[in-house]
Amino acid sequence: MAHKKAGGSTRNGRDSNAQRLGVKCFGGQLISAGSIIVKQRGTKFHPGKNVGCGKDHTIFAIVKGKVEFKKKGLKKRTYINIIN
């Protein structure tokens, strides 16, 4: 009879799921109210006109319209606006 002894154990073999962060709607794109524009950690992008910010810093549209990215201020922060 063929014999195979027990294999050793390993401490590897785990991996976390991707977080799927990033820009979901780009500049000039038409979107509806409630659509997610950016999923992010921290505020790389800041909410502007007609845009809201969730507790996990997700930027979303409040009204239907066109997405606009604008750099503003001394620190050149990127603000996202919706033009309707």
From Swiss-Prot:
Keywords: Ribonucleoprotein, Ribosomal protein. One of its GO terms (cellular component) is cytosolic large ribosomal subunit. GO terms for molecular function: structural constituent of ribosome. GO terms for biological process: translation. Coiled coil: none annotated. InterPro entries: Ribosomal_bL27. Belongs to the bacterial ribosomal protein bL27 family. This is Large ribosomal subunit protein bL27.
